[in-house]
A protein has these predicted regions:
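Short, surface-exposed "cap/lid" segments of acyl-processing enzymes
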Residues: 24-70, 74, 78
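A residue-identity detector for tryptophan
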Residues: 8, 43-46, 60, 102, ...
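Residue-level recognition of the N-termini of beta-strands and the immediately preceding loop/turn
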Residues: 30, 111-112
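Alpha/beta-hydrolase active-site loop
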Residues: 82-111
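N-terminal cap/lid segment of alpha/beta-hydrolase-fold proteins
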Residues: 1-26
């Protein structure tokens, strides 16, 4: 399974982008990668990090937090600075909880 720029519903019901890659020889473990307070899922070397872990048979999920300044249509260019201004750590924790629920709906046989 390989989902790129899929949508999940994050904090306050705000849609954001998520990637999920499950290798053929999946070991049942998924790494959930969180980019940090001022970042996004496709910044820098994060795709290389994903590739490394998938080659080790881990599933890999990375996502934009719902209030990182990106949108579901444009996750990179910071088109919504107002949402970023309303971001909190609590919203990012809620996003993580919602991503785990999203994974439970998408992936069978993982140890989450």
């Amino acid at each position: 399974m390989n989902l790129k720029n899929a949508n999940y519903s994050g904090a306050n019901g705000r849609n954001s982008l998520i990637d999920l890659e499950i290798p053929e020889e999946f070991n049942g473990e998924i790494i959930i990668f969180i980019h940090g307070f001022m970042g996004f899922k496709d910044w820098g070397a994060w795709n290389l990090v994903q590739q490394f872990f998938v080659q080790q048979n881990y599933g890999f999920c990375k996502f934009n937090t719902s209030h990182n300044g990106g949108t579901a249509d444009n996750g990179i260019d910071f088109p919504d600075p107002e949402s970023f201004g309303n971001n909190t750590y609590s919203k990012e924790i809620e996003d993580l909880q919602l991503v785990v629920q999203w994974l439970n709906d998408k992936v069978e046989n993982w140890n989450g």
